[in-house]
């Protein structure tokens, strides 16, 4: 071929490609179906803040097909109304804007001036009230509400002075015919400490049928916030009489006011911890519990300790559940909206957090913003709100999510869509609106359309704060597609964007060949140019379209690109356009009818590349008469349809070239597959898993020969390497993905000719996640598109399993800070008298380090840390100050700390002991730091149910919240005293007191009392029944009633724990104090209390080092009953027995006496406590984990690792059993991880049920380590900060050293691929702390005669000095002769001092 012909062909190729690129630009120029050139703009006077709030209003006749009454309600809160209202300036206005007349008319919601009382005194101020700051409409009603949250009401003091209370007010109207005022906070509850600053109307919402009006008042009660539910048709007096609440005293209505639906409901005041929470900042209505009745979601952006909270209530303000944010200061709940995003018919909740900042960004970005999309769904009530999607903003300071609105189904695909406003986003910070489309799985990952302020008009100035207000979901122009309204209050402009009809196109293109092969020898076509015979094939393309509001016919621009993978050297061309592989055409389709085009394509005479498939690409788009420039405004232009761009608009199909294979043109290859690899692979090894593959063809050519390997999901494909000296067979592979069922496909020749081989090796590496199988199961296959000879396929498939070798070594170490310390007990106080932490004793920090010293990862391990929090007789010993500080991949269960609410040292609380010791390098890795006294918090999105029974998939379900606590009588009396001081004008100390209360945690938030009626016998059996009395709170968070709880147990006595704490079984262990001992576990009852002081923890005895062995001789128990002891006894006293007895039987009422003997000290200290128990010992060996009949005594050995099994029931007659069954999560059985997934009866090893304590009662802290690797950064650390109670140490050992230790027991619970290990892997480590009292200072003794002699000498010297002074006349008094000095007045420089 000549050079000119080659040049012409390349030019012919270049021109169509350019046309194709221009076509693609035209397709994306106007975005999707929110049309920009046809927008409608409304303006008002400058600085009126026109567009601050907007709401689409359907009106009485505004349904699809009749748009005469569909309008847009726009608020302008600084609009000057002095022409309409006498004596009022900038009261604000509300406008009704219509597409029909292109104008906005002022709606006379409030046309009167300031109100006056009977004495003609002005009682309110409407100037600057910001009417129009909030507007809302009913979805299926003609009700409209407009609010003025800065409206001021004046209440009169006894001295006739004005009070200025910004109570706020709202106005309602049905279709703008009559207007009524609703001001729920205009009462006698003046002052910001009550409802004087409530700013009612800061937010408002109307349910779908217009039967309920919701008004938010975020300023009530020190800005805790409040929400009202009001019947909109009721008429209310100007102000309720006396101190009655809103909704009483003269309410007039045409309905029965005794019915609940005609009454006013509101949330009540909460505890001071919820001050400045702003409940009522935003709200939206919807069915959030599936009862087909609309509820209301209320924003509380500063609630939940500043992370934000959404309170979801029913129409009568009964709480359903709450949702808490994740990040402090993100303003979670600033904006709210609902939309059926996944198309399941349920309302999904959209939550805006415009102040969200990514803490991991390194670019200094802040206020990026975030939107949370919570999908309502799930098979059970607990999983209704467990699906969450997050969409983050894109630019710093953009405040993505400041405005939200539903769009309905804007593109006609059956899924709800929504818009997100970012009013400070964009190239110049003028604002951007993002459009998101729904799908069956939730919102699409990326916005379907982005509308920037700079795209709106033909040049500057562009509007600012574009997207500050949004409204959508209604069809404004009558084409059945909902439209979008956007407010830009800084520019006093509002825009309405119309939606274009969407055509859903179904299209396909394919070659007319079932085998997808074309033979070069089949030359059935002839070229016109040179009459050559060429191989050819038929290409068929079909289209059809459907959709709403579409014309009967549509024109489409279509194009084809042949051999798309080889644009520079194409091999396939159109027969009608010889030498061209690109074709453009315009077609006309009829609505709902399928239209097909057939084109004959041919191949070149000589094809060098026979391996690359021949691929065709077909594209289509609607033909448009509109110019491509989107900046030109075409306001009155007809909205042309647009294709659904969520569908595939590029169609593809491919065929392969077939070689000649004999006279029958049928090739029968014979592929042989051989694979070699290891039998066992070490998990965690740095070397990859290598698989060597050898494929040979011993018969005819194999077309599209391929190798398939189904890989386990836990392995990742790394690389493929060809082997052998001759690499004449190219190999290309597509990596395994979930979409192709984790199948690696390698093309090994097209064709793989006879006698050729493919020899290569594949490298695989494990992923970070771990499967549940103990081996890697592989399936290999080699095949081709042409079938082999029957009977020869047996060597084409291989199945093989590669075992997984897991090698781990759990190691635990620890240190004490300090490990030795001198103390002086006189410098400290009793714990009951202490007020701050350093009053009770010296601080000690125990740090544990958990490592893995072998290559395989430990997927999960449990660590139990036992610390002696009190002696066996109940004296506090080691006082826990904080939640454990953790570093690495470890989490610890919450444990009660600082139970006496001592004032903690802030520096010590904030200090990271792990970082100080070099365990971690970044303070962000530290967790567990808390300064509260009895609880810990987090910043994660969770849902709190009004009635719950545990945890659901990481979503907390609780039955009470801080924001709904009812005021106690003491708090009510405090409020009354504050009101008195406020009225007298002296309330400064009230403000300080409230501020201090707001930052303190309450000691006790709720209590649970459990009563049991039991019938028991001497064997300890019984059938107890219990009623758990839940508390009921009144307010905006929870309205719960009593909860019935019934449980049964095989014990006659057991403890019931609070429902929100980890359930643990409490036992009093009477164990030995020496090298071996015997004790029978006994259970007892108690009252459970949540928050504040709580001693409900697992008890037992702990070896206290030298205290146990060197300084304590005995522990005596005096029994009012019988005792038999074949071993040695202590003394001859009847009823006494020694604690280290090997066996014995005891019963009755006991008193415990502790006796200590120390050199140089004579004395006895007694502790008394009463415990009823009865039992008979059996046998138990700690280190071999064996049991014998009866209950569980303990044999202990010094310095030996300890672990125990689960507290299984052993119901032998005459013995105790501590297991129980319960109908809820609250019971006496300790929570544990269950590895018995397949229902096996074998119980896993449990090391936490019976603490290895021997001489003290222990508190057990459970921690879970995950993914413990071998790298330096994989180690896990736990630091426990406590203080030793000096007074208790003095009682135990007043002048000798005292050794106290904590013990950590680690147990591997989960290994990768294996699960729970068959043999227990338990490691222990004990940290010792030695405390020694300071030695007493013995003063030097002075002889008595020296003292007497010194006293006599001093007396003589004193008498001599007196005598000398007397002789000198010191004791004689001489008065002055001149008395003039005494008559001078005492002026001191001031008039009037003469009378002093």
Curated annotation (Swiss-Prot):
Name of this chain's protein: Integrin alpha-PS2
The keyword ATP-binding is assigned to this record: no
Residue ranges with Basic and acidic residues bias: 963-979
FG-GAP repeat feature ranges: 36-106, 117-174, 186-239, 266-317, 318-383, 386-445, 452-514
Stretch list, region Disordered: 960-1107, 1159-1246, 1377-1396
Quaternary structure, from the entry: Heterodimer of an alpha and a beta subunit. The alpha subunit is composed of a heavy and a light chain linked by a disulfide bond. Alpha-PS2 associates with beta-PS.
Presence of keyword Transcription: no
Main location: membrane
Extracellular side: 32-1341
Assigned protein family: Belongs to the integrin alpha chain family.
Keywords assigned by UniProt, alphabetized: Cell adhesion, Cell membrane, Disulfide bond, Glycoprotein, Integrin, Membrane, Olfaction, Receptor, Repeat, Sensory transduction, Signal, Transmembrane, Transmembrane helix
This protein's GO CC annotations: apical plasma membrane; basal plasma membrane; external side of plasma membrane; focal adhesion; integrin complex; lateral plasma membrane; plasma membrane; sarcolemma
Native organism taxonomy: Eukaryota, Metazoa, Ecdysozoa, Arthropoda, Hexapoda
Localization: Apical cell membrane; Lateral cell membrane; Basal cell membrane
Tissue specificity remark: In ovaries, highly expressed in follicle cells. At syncytial blastoderm stage, expressed in the embryonic mesodermal precursors but not in the ectoderm. At embryonic stages 7 and 10, expression is restricted to the mesoderm. At stage 12, expressed in the gonadal sheath and the interstitial cells of the gonad. In stage 16 embryos, expressed in the somatic and visceral muscles where localizes to sites of attachment between adjacent muscles. In third larval instar wing imaginal disk, expressed in the ventral compartment and in a subset of adepithelial and peripodial cells (at protein level).
Signal peptide: 1-31
Cytoplasmic side: 1367-1396
Membrane topology type: Single-pass type I membrane protein
Gene3D superfamilies reported in the protein's UniProt record: Bicelle-embedded integrin alpha(iib) transmembrane segment, Integrin alpha, N-terminal, Integrin domains. Chain A, domain 2, ntegrin, alpha v. Chain A, domain 3, ntegrin, alpha v. Chain A, domain 4
Biased composition regions of type Low complexity, renumbered to the chain: 1007-1021, 1060-1071, 1162-1182, 1217-1226
InterPro entries per record: FG-GAP (IPR013517), Int_alpha_beta-p (IPR013519), Integrin_alpha (IPR000413), Integrin_alpha_C_CS (IPR018184), Integrin_alpha_Ig-like_1 (IPR013649), Integrin_alpha_Ig-like_2 (IPR048285), Integrin_alpha_Ig-like_3 (IPR048286), Integrin_alpha_N (IPR028994)
Sample GO molecular function, one term: extracellular matrix binding
């Amino acid at each position: 071929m000549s050079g000119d012909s080659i040049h012409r062909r390349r030019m012919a190729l270049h021109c169509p490609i350019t046309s194709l690129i221009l076509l693609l630009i035209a397709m994306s120029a106007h975005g999707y179906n929110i049309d920009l050139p046809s927008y409608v703009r409304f303006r008002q006077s400058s600085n009126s803040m026109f567009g601050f709030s907007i709401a689409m209003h359907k009106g009485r006749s505004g349904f699809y097909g009749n748009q005469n009454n569909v309008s847009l309600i726009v608020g302008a809160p600084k609009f000057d109304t002095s022409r309409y209202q006498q004596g009022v300036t900038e009261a604000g206005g509300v406008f009704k804007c219509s597409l029909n007349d292109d104008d906005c008319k002022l709606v006379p919601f409030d046309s009167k001036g300031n109100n006056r009382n009977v004495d003609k005194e002005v009682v309110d101020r409407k100037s600057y009230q910001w009417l129009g700051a909030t507007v809302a409409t009913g979805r299926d009603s003609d009700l409209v509400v407009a609010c003025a949250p800065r409206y001021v009401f004046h209440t009169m003091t006894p001295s006739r002075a004005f009070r200025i209370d910004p109570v706020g007010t709202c106005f309602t109207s049905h279709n703008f015919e009559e207007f009524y005022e609703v001001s729920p906070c205009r009462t006698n509850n003046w002052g910001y400490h009550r409802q004087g600053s409530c700013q009612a109307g800061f937010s408002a919402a109307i349910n779908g049928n217009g039967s309920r009006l919701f008004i938010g008042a975020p300023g009530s009660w020190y800005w805790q916030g409040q929400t009202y539910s009001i019947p909109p048709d009721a008429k209310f007096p100007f102000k309720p009489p006396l101190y009655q609440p809103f909704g009483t005293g003269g309410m007039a209505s045409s309905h029965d006011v005794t019915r609940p639906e005609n009454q006013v409901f509101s949330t009540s005041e909460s505890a001071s911890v919820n001050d400045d929470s702003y409940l009522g900042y935003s709200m939206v209505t919807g069915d959030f519990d599936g009862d087909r009745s609309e509820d209301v979601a209320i924003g509380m952006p500063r609630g939940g300790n500043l992370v934000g909270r959404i309170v979801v209530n029913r129409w009568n303000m009964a709480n359903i559940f709450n949702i808490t944010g994740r990040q402090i200061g993100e303003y979670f709940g600033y904006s709210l909206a609902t939309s059926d995003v996944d198309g399941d018919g349920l309302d999904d909740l959209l939550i805006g957090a415009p102040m969200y900042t990514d803490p991991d960004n390194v670019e200094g970005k802040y206020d990026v913003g975030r939107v949370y999309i919570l999908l309502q769904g799930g098979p059970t009530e607990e999983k209704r709100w467990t699906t969450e999607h997050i969409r983050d903003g894109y630019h710093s300071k953009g405040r993505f999510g400041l405005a939200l609105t539903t769009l309905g189904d804007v593109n006609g695909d059956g899924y709800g869509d929504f818009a997100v406003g970012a009013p400070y986003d964009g190239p110049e910070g003028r604002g951007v609106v993002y459009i998101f489309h729904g799908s069956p799985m939730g919102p699409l990952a990326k916005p379907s359309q982005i509308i920037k302020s700079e795209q709106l008009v033909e040049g500057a100035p562009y509007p600012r704060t574009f997207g500050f207000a949004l409204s959508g979901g209604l069809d404004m122009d009558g084409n059945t597609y909902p439209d979008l309204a956007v407010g830009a209050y800084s520019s006093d402009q509002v825009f309405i964007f119309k939606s274009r009809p969407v055509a859903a196109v179904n299209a396909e293109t394919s070659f007319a060949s079932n085998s997808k092969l074309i033979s070069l020898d089949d030359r059935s076509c002839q070229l016109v140019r040179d009459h050559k015979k060429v191989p050819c094939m038929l290409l068929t393309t079909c289209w059809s379209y459907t959709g709403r509001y579409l014309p009967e016919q549509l024109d489409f621009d279509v194009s084809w690109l042949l051999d798309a993978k080889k644009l520079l050297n194409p091999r396939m061309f159109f027969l009608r356009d010889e030498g061209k592989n690109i074709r453009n055409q315009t077609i006309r389709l009829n609505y709902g009818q399928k239209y097909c085009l057939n084109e004959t394509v041919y191949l070149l005479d000589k094809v060098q590349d026979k391996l690359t498939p021949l691929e065709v690409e077909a594209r289509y788009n609607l033909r448009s008469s509109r110019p491509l420039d989107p900046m030109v405004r075409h306001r009155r232009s007809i909205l042309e349809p647009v294709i659904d761009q969520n569908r595939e608009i590029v169609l593809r199909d491919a065929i392969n070239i077939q070689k000649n294979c004999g006279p029958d043109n049928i090739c029968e290859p014979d592929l042989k597959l051989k694979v070699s690899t290891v039998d066992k692979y070490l998990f965690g090894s740095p070397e990859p898993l290598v698989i060597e593959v050898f494929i040979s063809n011993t018969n005819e050519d194999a077309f599209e020969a391929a190798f398939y390997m189904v890989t386990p999901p836990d392995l990742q494909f790394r690389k493929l390497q060809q082997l052998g000296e001759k690499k004449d067979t190219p190999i290309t592979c597509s990596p395994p993905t979930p979409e192709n069922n984790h199948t690696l496909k390698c093309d090994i020749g097209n064709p793989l000719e006879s006698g050729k081989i493919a020899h290569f090796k594949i490298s695989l590496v494990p992923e970070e996640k771990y499967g549940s199988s103990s081996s890697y199961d592989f399936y290999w296959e080699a095949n081709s598109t042409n079938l082999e000879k029957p009977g020869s396929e047996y060597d084409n498939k291989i199945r093989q399993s590669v075992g997984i070798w897991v090698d781990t070594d759990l190691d635990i170490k620890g240190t004490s800070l300090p490990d030795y310390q001198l103390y002086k007990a006189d410098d400290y106080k009793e714990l009951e008298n202490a007020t701050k932490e350093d009053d009770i004793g010296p601080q000690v920090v125990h740090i544990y380090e958990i490592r893995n010293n072998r290559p395989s990862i430990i997927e999960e391990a449990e660590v139990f840390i036992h610390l002696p929090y009190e002696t066996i007789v109940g004296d506090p010993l080691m006082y826990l100050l904080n939640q454990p500080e953790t570093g690495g991949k470890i989490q610890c269960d919450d444990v009660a700390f600082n139970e006496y609410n001592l004032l903690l040292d802030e520096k010590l609380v904030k200090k990271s002991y792990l970082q100080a010791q070099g365990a971690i390098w970044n303070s962000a890795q530290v967790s567990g730091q808390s300064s509260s006294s009895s609880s810990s918090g987090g910043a994660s999105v969770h849902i709190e149910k009004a009635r719950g029974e545990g945890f659901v998939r990481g979503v907390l379900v609780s039955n009470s919240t801080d924001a709904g606590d009812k005021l106690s009588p003491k708090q009510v009396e405090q409020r009354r005293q504050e009101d008195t001081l406020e009225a007298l004008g002296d309330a400064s100390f009230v403000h300080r007191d409230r501020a201090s209360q707001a930052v303190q945690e309450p000691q006790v938030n709720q209590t649970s009392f459990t009563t049991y009626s039991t019938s028991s016998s001497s064997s300890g059996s019984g059938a107890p029944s219990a009623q758990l009395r839940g508390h009921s709170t009144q307010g905006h968070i929870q309205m719960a009633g009593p909860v019935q709880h019934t449980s049964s147990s095989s014990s006659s006595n057991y403890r019931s724990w609070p429902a929100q704490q980890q359930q643990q079984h409490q036992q009093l262990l009477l164990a030995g104090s020496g090298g071996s001992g015997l004790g029978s576990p006994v259970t007892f009852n108690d009252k459970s209390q949540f928050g504040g002081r709580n001693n409900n923890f697992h008890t037992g005895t702990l070896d206290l080092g030298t205290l146990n062995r060197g300084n304590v001789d005995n522990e005596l128990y005096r029994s009012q009953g019988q005792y038999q002891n074949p071993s040695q006894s202590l003394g001859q006293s009847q009823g006494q027995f020694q604690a280290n007895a090997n066996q014995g039987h005891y019963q009755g009422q006991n008193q415990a006496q502790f006796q200590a003997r120390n050199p140089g000290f004579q004395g006895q200290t007694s502790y008394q406590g009463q415990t009823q128990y009865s039992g008979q010992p059996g046998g138990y060996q700690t280190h071999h984990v064996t049991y014998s009949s009866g209950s569980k005594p303990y044999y202990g050995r010094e310095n030996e690792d300890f672990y125990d099994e689960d507290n299984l029931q052993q119901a032998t007659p005459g013995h105790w059993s501590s297991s129980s069954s319960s109908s809820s999560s609250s019971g006496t059985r300790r929570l544990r991880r269950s590895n018995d997934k397949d229902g096996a009866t074998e119980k896993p090893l449990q090391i936490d049920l019976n603490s290895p304590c021997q001489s003290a009662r222990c508190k057990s802290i459970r921690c879970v380590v995950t993914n413990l690797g071998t790298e330096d950064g994989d180690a896990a650390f736990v630091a426990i900060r406590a203080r030793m109670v000096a007074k208790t140490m003095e009682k135990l050992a007043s002048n000798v050293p005292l050794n106290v230790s904590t013990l950590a027991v680690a147990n591997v619970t989960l290994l990768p691929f294996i699960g729970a290990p068959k043999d227990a892997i338990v490691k222990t480590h004990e940290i010792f702390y030695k405390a020694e009292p300071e030695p007493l200072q013995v003063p030097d003794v002075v002889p008595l005669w020296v003292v007497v002699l010194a006293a006599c000498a001093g007396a003589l010297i004193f008498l001599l000095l007196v005598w000398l002074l007397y002789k000198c006349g010191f004791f004689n008094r001489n008065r002055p002769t001149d008395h003039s000095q005494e008559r001078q007045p005492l002026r001191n420089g001031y008039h009037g001092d003469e009378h002093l």
